[in-house]
Amino acid sequence: IEDRPGLLALKIDPDTHQPVPYVVPGGRFNEMYGWDSYFIGLGLIAHDQYELARGMLENMAYQIRHYGRMLNANRSYYLSRSQPPFYTPYLRAILDAYGDRVPLAWIREHLGIAIDEYENVWMNPQTHLTNTGLSRYYGEGKGRPKETEPGHFDFELKKYADRHGLDVREFERRYDSGEIVEPELDNWFVHDRSMRESGLDTTTRFDGVCASLACVDLNSILYRVETDLAALTDLYMAGEFTWRGASYPSGHWRAQAEKRRQLMKTFLWNEADGTWYDWNIDTQRQQPFVSASNLMPLWAGAATPEEARRAVASQLPQLLKSGGIASTGPIDKHNQPGPERQWDAPYGWAPHQIMIWEGLRRYGYDAQAQQAAFAWLRMLVRAAIEYNGLITEKFNVEKQSHKVDAEYGNVGARFEYVPAGGFGWTNTSFLLGLGYLSDAQKAELDALAG
């Protein structure tokens, strides 16, 4: 039995007939997650773990090839939604590091798979492409997401239960069976599923509205996808690439990227506030919301120098705390239903740190990138020293603490479950963050560690 693939195996090596290994986030997450895999993979590359880093991409490709998308995670109840599309940026990261170690046929295959994901998922007008020409997150399926814990949605279900004169559990049973039909609640769950596809589950920014938003973060990633495809086509395919009978020259991708950049300027850029905001396709208005995602156009290279200057000036002071970048600006929690949202302030997560550091450096804001990286790494070192090597999935960046009073708790924070390997993308953030620090700052971290 031990020699046979397990239930969570994905790609099988045709030579060894064994599963191609992948790295899971850690803690209770023992399957392969979509955008976690990109950031874990960056850490593997930084640590020169070629086989594992390549294996991560092979398993991503397997999912796109067989399930039509890179899944939220490889469980059957995630088949109806993806996560942020980092397959192409990860392919480029692999090739930037190891392009001389893989055959051209392998590159050709993965370029084609990248195109399949881009066209069939993110540019699909039936689901993700909006009438603005920009894309949105859209979780398919109906009703409550199956992976959520019992009682997770009670705060929302209660108002419908009261309307029907039922307790929450009985209403839930009748709604799930189809005995009670509530189109308004169905629509609310579409937004909830879409929020989970965004990876930011959950945040006030997307609550009850996610599927209506052409998002800053998603369109920044897709701009990066388009520019990466242009660069890879030039570098490895002499500017011309044919896939499934269609031609995709590098110029096609540059034109797509420029079109998206102009659409982002038209719909997402707010001249008065000097930043980008999500666009609501139903209200035909921007949704002003201070978020770490507002700085993602810098990571993608989609900002002009002047846009970058204004966005850094307007957003960074509201996001940078003593422990790093918060997910959002301050949230008014007085009238907020349900528990605290883990992707709201005061909580900060590794992927936002990594992308914002990279974006700041790309546009010449080295001092700000260094300041943000040092704040985050100093907090990680203190937490590890004070709590038995603790490295968790998220932190309270205002209190510089792993203690999180929000939905889902904090994976890795209970001592009996402290993951021996830390937590995937947080580990990567430490490795990459060191590259932003001065020698004096590194010495300070060493002194903290004793």
For each predicted feature, which ranges?
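Aromatic- and histidine-enriched alpha-helix N-cap/loop-to-helix transition segments
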Residues: 31-39, 78-89, 109, 113, ...
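Alpha-helical support elements that line or immediately flank enzyme active sites
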Residues: 33-63, 293-305, 353-366
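Aromatic/His-enriched, Gly/Pro-containing loop or helix-boundary segments
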Residues: 64-110, 346
